[in-house]
Regions:
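Positively charged, solvent-exposed patches that mediate nucleic-acid binding
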Residues: 1-114
């Protein structure tokens, strides 16, 4: 579970990031991010009802949270506010494939610490 300091929870925060943020796309995932002055990395997840029933959407969010939590422990992500948005095709991916998609979108705009 992500600690409270690393979670985006408020609708207003999501709206601000969608409005002001930059987008990075892959086949199954979209990343929207905006730089922040805070020292904490904050992450939110959005999985539309087009993806499937609630248990499928929750599975995707749990997997994404686990991947991000692992990256945060390794200090691999630069300090920004992030929203990961899942496409409907994401249900076809295994955990390892999903992890590679997350790393791909983060690398695409240089958001991984070396």
């Amino acid at each position: 579970m992500l600690v409270k300091e690393n979670r985006l929870t408020k609708r207003k925060e999501f709206g601000y990031i969608y409005k002001k943020g930059r987008s990075v796309y892959s086949k199954h995932l979209m990343l929207v991010y905006v730089p922040t002055k805070l020292k904490n990395i904050r992450v939110g997840f959005s999985v539309s009802k087009k993806v499937g029933k609630a248990h499928t959407r929750n599975l995707i969010k749990r997997r994404l949270r686990a991947i991000i939590q692992d990256l945060l422990k390794q200090n691999l992500i630069k300090t920004n506010n992030y929203i990961f948005v899942a496409n409907s095709s994401i249900t076809e991916l295994s955990f390892e494939e999903l992890k590679s998609q997350v790393l791909y979108v983060l690398n695409k705009d240089g958001l991984i610490n070396e």
